[in-house]
Regions:
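N-terminal glycine-/serine-/threonine-rich beta1-alpha1-beta2 phosphate-ribose binding loop
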Residues: 1-96
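Rossmann-like NAD(P)H-binding beta-loop-alpha module
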Residues: 120-201, 208
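Short, ordered loop/turn segments at secondary-structure junctions
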Residues: 45-47, 65, 105-107, 113, ...
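Catalytic, metal-anchored helix/loop core of enzyme active sites in primary metabolism
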Residues: 152-155, 163-166, 170, 182, ...
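Rossmann-fold NAD(P)-binding glycine/threonine-rich loop
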Residues: 86-95, 105-134, 139-143
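A conserved regulatory-domain signal marking ACT and ACT-like small-molecule sensing domains
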Residues: 314-316, 320-431
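A short hydrophobic/small-residue beta-strand
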Residues: 99-101, 377
Length: 431
């Protein structure tokens, strides 16, 4: 049996996980798949990694071009991150007829079109399972298990940091800042957590996922994004009174006139399976015409889950190399030209919280503005006034409404002298 030679670019958190997995379970992979994987080169700028991971002198290098220029290497695994050097290395690897595996979500979200064009041109394979759901095999599921289905909707909890923070706030009644501090202390949030809490990480992932689910190129910059840093513990508590849990959801939905892709905090009914996805776990719910609703759940980040997905891609590509199967260009070609629907035109239910003076007529005044903008109230909670506060919270749930109508109404309501500050809007998942 011929070995399939692998070159690693980057031996950080994920790269070291891949090295350790192949070292520990290489024989298991060979016995289960008949594929003998050998890491021929590991490139990393940190010389100390060699000793830490026990990498032999002849295998380790600080020059990534030693990996790309090695004629014996079949598969190049890019795990250095970033979008500049990583892009150059991937394009160069494709040009040298190397197959590619990457976990780089930011790179694929921004430059996926260019990278897939090059892959098609050079007739090489690219695996990117780890770029979306960490250890959840959602790309493979969509491309293979659901190949006979027309997918109509994807709803994902795609960022473990945000889910951990929201779970902390919900379960322990602590505010956002304290929950973030605890997430950082436990290693579930970066020192600079902005990409996670802003929704940026989830936006990268849903752009990649929806591109392959709907066979169209999704411009990630046009995906509406709102993070969790504006979520108040009060809103989590009030939402629970209505029977909802707060989650950061990434949603892609197919309509007759196009596709809507968005990321924002969302209230999820407690009976929905997504409400039970806690702490750092991720989940993806897929709606399709023949299978119906299916859900995929697991660890979305971390060295081991991500390494598991990377090695699955390596093994998959290695199998195609050894079988000498005909190159399938359809794996990386997008055949639909769907229009992305503007977020302002989207329709859903809403949660509103106003801080209002406790005066007669304010509820009817607000309801009048909502009615003028075609927004129907489903239920209301008005809390008792506390002695030290002049204003009281007025909380509402609506029926379906259009985003641009909601924004117009809120602008008017927030201008009322009886309303303090900017009112809070959270969208609701319509089951």
């Amino acid at each position: 049996m011929r070995e399939v030679a692998v070159g690693l670019l980057g031996a950080g958190t994920v790269g070291s996980g891949v090295w350790e997995l192949l070292k520990k379970n290489g024989a298991l992979i060979k016995n289960k798949s008949g594929i003998d994987l050998r890491v021929l080169k590991v490139a990393d700028k940190d010389q100390k990694i060699k000793k830490t991971l026990g990498i032999a002198d002849e295998v380790f290098t600080q020059d990534p071009m030693e990996v790309l220029n090695n004629p014996d290497i079949d598969i190049v695994v890019e795990l250095i991150g970033g979008t500049t050097v990583a892009k150059e290395l991937i394009l160069s690897a494709a040009g040298k007829k190397k197959h590619i595996v990457t976990a780089n979500k930011a790179l694929l979200a921004q430059y996926g079109g260019e990278i897939f064009d090059r892959v098609l041109q050079e007739e090489v394979e690219i695996g990117f399972e780890a770029s979306v759901g960490g250890g959840i095999p959602i790309i493979k599921t969509i491309r293979e298990a659901l190949v006979g289905n027309r997918i109509t909707k994807i709803i994902g909890i795609l960022n473990g940091t945000s889910n951990f923070i929201l779970t902390k706030m919900t379960r322990e009644g602590i505010d956002f800042d304290r929950a973030l501090e605890q997430a950082q202390a436990l290693g579930f949030a970066e020192t600079d957590p902005n990409l996670d809490i802003s929704g940026g990480d989830a936006r990268h992932k849903i752009a990649i996922l929806s591109s392959f689910a709907f066979n169209t190129v999704i411009d990630h910059d046009s995906v509406y994004m709102e993070g969790i840093d504006g979520i108040d513990i009060k809103d989590i508590a009030y939402a629970e009174e209505f029977g909802f849990v707060t989650k950061l959801l990434a949603v892609a939905q197919l309509f007759d006139h196009g596709i809507l892709v968005k990321v924002h905090p969302t209230l999820v009914n407690k009976e929905n399976p997504l409400a039970a996805v806690l702490w750092e776990d991720n989940a993806v719910m897929v709606e399709s015409d023949f299978l119906g609703t299916s859900m995929y759940y697991g660890k979305g980040a971390g060295a081991r889950p991500t390494a598991s997905a990377v090695v699955a891609d390596i093994t998959d590509i290695a199998g195609r190399i050894l079988s000498r199967s005909e190159y399938n260009s359809k794996r990386y070609a997008f055949f639909s030209d769907l229009q992305q629907i503007a977020f302002e035109k989207s329709r859903t239910r809403y949660y509103f919280r106003f801080n209002v003076l406790d005066r007669p007529g304010i509820l009817s005044k607000i309801a009048g503005v909502l009615g003028d903008n075609r927004i129907s109230i489903a239920s209301v909670i008005q809390k008792e006034k506390e002695e030290k506060f002049e204003h009281v919270p007025l909380v509402m749930m609506t029926h379906d409404a259009v985003e641009e109508d909601v924004r117009k109404a809120m602008k008017t309501i927030d201008s009322f002298p009886e309303v303090e500050g900017e009112s809070r809007i959270i969208r609701v998942l319509v089951d």
